[in-house]
């Protein structure tokens, strides 16, 4: 049994690892910090100072013992630590030893061994909250200059059963330390794998992990301390000790290298700032504030703006915000345990007895300073019969010894004996708190004025230099997207995100943009628009990636541009001044077809597209070994480090991720800039094909490096393009058949910037109508006019689409009721009449919403519809339906029905529809399109004839709706300014002119009226090319 205090407090060995016996095995540490270590040989145990002979005899279990501190006078058994070592009638535990010859103490009937290196949670700086939520195991991190920082993606918060163990804090924490001195200390240690953590001397409040690698290079990794958490390499930890434990036992810091040897400071460092509450406070609901009592002690983690601080309350272990007006500094001379709920630093021994007997219950406890040995502590514990005391001795290496066991903190001792018996049949339960919180405080504080001051403080200023803020969707681990609140902080180039704007204090995560690139994400990758990704790039091969989505294309573009300005790779790109040349690269890929894919591996092949090693897009799956995709992918404003594209082929299955089977790579340097390359690429295989040829893939690629001069250089070029006759536009339309989509996009942005989009669209539409002989084939072909109209509608009518469709589509997504009418697709015993009734109900609600949404369409778009109606009426005056059908062909065929069929592409939903919902959306789109065409279902789809009564009853309303859309006779004034990069758009159009200069030259010799304009265009194109070369030379000189 462990002897309690009698006349003197129980002693114990003072030095760990020399003369004291420490318990070994898993019971010596909390379960979450357990690690197996090799056992050292049995060691001699030195007698403890102040331990009476009778106490020693009882502690060793040598027979009957008596005294006021014991439970009885007969044989005694005690439990302290879980390892029973017996040496007589009594069973003694917790480092029990027996007196041997010459006064030495030898172990009896058991072996106590001391680990060569005692590991456990840190007991010094910083605080040790519960274990962190660990990310998946990963490869190493890259290194950065200390002025930079290193971070990565947020991982989903989930409990991972990985034990984290680290040496005590005093073995690796050096406090504020110069970089040069840190490197000297590591080199003096002389072992690769040596490490230390220090506070950055360049960025106070941040920490640096300094590590000596196998190449004898000292690498410095910045650790971002934020509201009690610690971020490094995309991973978040609750303490520096957990971070050390993770990179010691779980993951590599550099490729193949872990933390091995802590380098201790010359003497232990304790530099945490502590403050004490001078007044009580009750938190404001739904904030990150914490409530506290007068006298509570806090550890300060972050000093935020406007007097706010992020702290841990030592009494409750709660973290949150407090304001500095309610606290006072705690000096270094005060005991570091002040503020802990179990610590009583200013009461006597008798007062401790009285508290336990009056306020406490059986198994209650408290800790106070030792009366007999300054610097030591006594743990007071109440049993059924009496109060027992146990001595706690600090050791020179900043640990604490009790009963022959070594711990990293008194808190660890308490945690241990909450789980293990401290006396047979007893565990520590509830501590007795201090009874008079005000005894150490100045009672003359003017609380009223302080509280009034706090009410005037704002928490909006926690983060300095906020460049941009707002909500974005962020992709989680699976297919879920979550709406989070983001702050782009400019001073430290960090993107910080939170659960909501109301709780924008403690981050959910952060990304250090100085080691990042921003990549576009094609709509095909997630089946939704407006996505982009931030790639955290390390020296290791693995990338950490964050995916985001904006509500609109403009929002996504704004965020991308804002983020790119702080990415280190962007900062290094040449030409940031308005008076210098900018360079922007882009890539257009057409995945056309594959030939002779291996039959064994492909039934439903699809392609994944990568820029370098980052996936940015994918095609649809197609059937067979000779699939045809004919899909286009445009990647704009590429990061400057992109030097190749890769295409892999996978086979579509029901698995969450299909493995890549075949692949091809192409260096961008192979492609002629500004020209389309059409080539069959031989495929290589990731798996053995056993003599089978992997096949080939046809890809058309166009890589362009845009050299963008200041906007004023393009003034004459712009005037020529904007001439109301549109001769240049017609000529480019003639020569740019394969680049039609790109040409349309550039022209639309230029004309939108000049508020001349109606001139462009109406003129091209009129020309299309004038050239068409058959009313039934009008706008059926894909032309520059139809492409421009489609792009313009998607750019301006998003609000209309959401208002008209979102509610109905969300109901379809949630419903389990089928709308299937086709006999070949009906399930057994499925009632087709029930399905039809459900379909008609959906159609009625949806069409009603569409009819009521006409006023939401932009007035300029409605004016263009009106111009279309006038033009077709003039061309076909006897055709009464053309004015209706020409508008429905754009509004429904190219806008509403595509949004119904694929609502993710229009950002209406975030998850893929179920098979039932997908089929319902198809039937709804089919029915709505027939209604818009004013056509009933016939013999081709007889199972759909049940929808005909609905179509008949709504034909008149459809005609009225479409006529109303075009009822804007005058071009409306608009105050909206198109947010485009005009100089870039003009430069891109100039590149198209350069690429097609030969065709334009041929055309200028054929077209009489346009001849003068085209020759002028060619001359301006050549002049701009010369100016561009001059800018390039100037940039090279600089």
UniProtKB/Swiss-Prot annotation:
The keyword Repeat applies. Pfam families: C2 (PF00168), PH (PF00169), RasGAP (PF00616), SH2 (PF00017), SH3_1 (PF00018). Residues 1-16 have a biased composition (Low complexity). GO terms for biological process: actin cytoskeleton organization; blood vessel morphogenesis; cell adhesion; cellular response to epidermal growth factor stimulus; cellular response to fibroblast growth factor stimulus; cellular response to platelet-derived growth factor stimulus; male genitalia development; mitotic cytokinesis. SMART domains: C2, PH, RasGAP, SH2, SH3. GO terms for molecular function: GTPase activator activity; GTPase binding; phosphotyrosine residue binding; platelet-derived growth factor receptor binding; protein kinase B binding; protein tyrosine kinase binding; protein-containing complex binding; receptor tyrosine kinase binding. One of its GO terms (cellular component) is nuclear membrane. Residues 172-263, 342-432 form the SH2 domain. This is Ras GTPase-activating protein 1.
